[in-house]
């Protein structure tokens, strides 16, 4: 395999010349009438959503497939700008394409999607004896299974969201070696105070997006909530289960799950409130946050300008693993200067010590975080049980598990589509895709490329992402495997005093409840209709 991969490098380098670039016909099927493939007897159209990782990786694997794997087929690529619109077209079977890469769930769409169980049994091209299902992790096979059938295949890797930070900026403002990454939320806020004194904001939120789609801080808050509940408690909460004398049961008549997790709700909300409103006269959130788009905030993290004017920078930003990819063109064009931006593990919510009786204070908690990271000894008196709680919390990472390949029921040349999908799971395709994503394993089929195989060294950012992925525990914000939470519209909190806006935005302008008020608001909001919603859900489930 290693020999074969080394030989492939030459092909990859050639492909990179053809596949890089933005939109039109580049010899990769990204137009309807690509002359290079015009005479091919078979064709199908793949409609894709160009997320943070861009589309160069997809163009590259499509080019490789058409040039080197199947020279009878032409794959035409079409860019979709809206996942919801694409899903609606698929659902109504109006103006659909043959295959989709879509970043939204496609559950309960068996009437309009091709069943893919046969694909899972196909052999992966170039890998004798290896089936497609062997390349997909069991947890994702379980996740996408619907009554014994499959209509979705996981697409891009779940590399999640976490805190990114600008080391260049931190070194220049605080002095290299004079600061440390925050291990707890108390340390995060203490660092924010130091930065504020240096004319640097700790972070920002994308307030211009009033729907909240780009305000990824909401994912951060939910991870802190999961840290307070633990993963088992988090799953129980959103599955609407509560502890009834030692047995976990569905809370049918009343939201007992909310009652059980009152402390987690209050303590998580308190951290969000402090982050957004500051403390001790210090501000942590950038003063222009209400006007920022997601891209604006990334510019501020990279010490760029805002609307043509130099602004105070931010040192941290809660972001996805595609952050480096999204800034690459701006660095190349000289719009922003190259910065040493990296990703870090989640600071542990300081209130977690209420779950860990042998950890008495934040300093001890920070030392246990070091132990969890493999950087020190377990402090004297701290139990292994409490250390395990902190380790689980430290490794949590937010993700939306909803990126799939699907085939429409009325697609043409379905056999050719399935052959292409089998190819996508190959190490060959995964290597080519990673080549066009700064070395990140963008395709979700288990292959992790080395620097030698890629032909270039990882950047500090890429290496930092890998360091997190090695032990990451996914907190799935989408929760499509928890249908009862969708039935009741369950969130970790509910502020009945506001209508619209995001938690970050409402807290920032102090148009939101306080941490002392949020539990009662949450309980009252859900208890009013809880019993009826659960009954409706059970009827829909045939129970």
What are the roles of these predicted feature ranges?
Residues 191-192, 233-296, 341-352, 357-382:
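Glycine-centered hinge/linker elements that transmit conformational signals in sensory
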Residues 59, 81-118, 130-153, 163, ...:
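Pocket-flanking alpha-helical
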Residues 1-4:
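Positively charged n-region of N-terminal signal peptides that target proteins for export
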Residues 6-7, 17-109, 124-132, 177-178, ...:
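Conserved N-terminal structural module of periplasmic/extracytoplasmic solute-binding proteins
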Residues 74-76, 148, 308, 312, ...:
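Extracytoplasmic/periplasmic substrate-recognition and gating elements
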Residues 430, 444-543:
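Conserved C-terminal helix/tail region of periplasmic/extracytoplasmic solute-binding proteins
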Residues 108-121, 138-180, 189-191, 206-252, ...:
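Periplasmic solute-binding protein
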Residues 102-161, 189, 344, 354-386, ...:
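Hinge/lid segment of periplasmic solute-binding proteins
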């Amino acid at each position: 395999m290693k020999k074969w991969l080394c030989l492939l490098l030459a092909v990859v380098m050639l492909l990179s010349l053809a596949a890089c670039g933005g939109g039109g016909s580049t010899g990769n099927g990204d137009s309807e009438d690509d002359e290079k493939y015009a005479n091919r007897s078979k064709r199908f159209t793949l409609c894709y959503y160009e997320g943070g990782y861009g589309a160069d990786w997809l163009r590259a694997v499509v080019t490789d497939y058409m040039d080197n794997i199947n020279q009878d087929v032409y794959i035409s690529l079409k860019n979709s700008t809206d996942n919801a619109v694409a899903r609606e077209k698929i659902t109504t079977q109006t103006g659909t394409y043959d295959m989709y890469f879509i970043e939204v769930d496609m559950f309960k769409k068996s009437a309009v999607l091709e069943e893919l169980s046969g694909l899972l049994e196909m052999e992966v091209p170039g890998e004798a004896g290896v089936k497609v299902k062997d390349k997909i992790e069991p947890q994702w096979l379980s996740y996408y299974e619907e009554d014994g059938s499959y209509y979705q295949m996981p697409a891009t890797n779940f590399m999640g969201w976490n805190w990114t930070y600008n080391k260049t900026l931190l070194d220049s403002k605080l002095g290299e070696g004079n600061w440390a990454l925050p291990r707890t939320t108390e340390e995060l806020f203490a660092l924010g105070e130091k930065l504020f004194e240096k004319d640097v904001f700790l972070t920002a939120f994308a307030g211009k997006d009033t729907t909240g789609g780009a305000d990824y801080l909401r994912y951060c808050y939910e991870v802190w909530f999961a840290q307070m509940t633990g993963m088992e408690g988090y799953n129980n909460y959103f599955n609407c289960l509560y502890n009834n004398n030692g047995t976990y049961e569905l809370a049918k008549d009343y939201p007992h799950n909310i009652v059980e997790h009152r402390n987690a709700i209050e303590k998580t909300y308190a951290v969000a409130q402090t982050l957004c409103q500051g403390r001790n006269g210090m501000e942590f959130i950038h003063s222009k946050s209400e006007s920022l788009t997601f891209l604006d905030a990334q510019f501020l993290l990279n010490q760029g300008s805002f609307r043509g004017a130099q602004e105070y920078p931010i040192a941290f930003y809660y972001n996805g693993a595609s952050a480096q990819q999204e800034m690459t063109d701006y660095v190349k064009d000289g719009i922003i200067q190259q910065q040493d931006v990296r990703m870090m593990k989640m600071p542990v919510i300081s209130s977690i010590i209420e779950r860990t009786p042998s950890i008495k204070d934040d300093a001890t908690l920070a030392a246990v975080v070091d132990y969890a990271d493999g950087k020190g000894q377990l402090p004297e008196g701290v139990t292994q049980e409490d250390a395990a709680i902190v380790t689980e919390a430290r490794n949590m990472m937010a993700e939306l598990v909803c990126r799939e390949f699907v085939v429409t029921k009325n697609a043409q040349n379905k056999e050719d589509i399935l052959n292409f999908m089998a190819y996508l799971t190959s190490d060959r395709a995964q290597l080519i895709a990673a080549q066009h994503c700064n070395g990140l394993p963008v395709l979700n089929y288990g292959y992790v490329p080395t620097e030698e195989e890629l032909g270039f060294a990882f950047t500090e950012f890429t290496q930092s992402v890998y360091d997190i992925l090695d032990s990451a525990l996914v907190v799935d914000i989408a929760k499509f495997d928890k249908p009862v939470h969708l039935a009741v519209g369950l969130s970790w909190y509910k502020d009945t005093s506001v209508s619209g806006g995001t938690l970050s935005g409402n807290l920032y302008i102090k148009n939101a409840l306080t941490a002392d008020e949020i539990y009662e608001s949450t309980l009252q909001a859900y208890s009013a209709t809880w019993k009826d919603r659960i009954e409706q859900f059970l009827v829909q489930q045939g129970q």
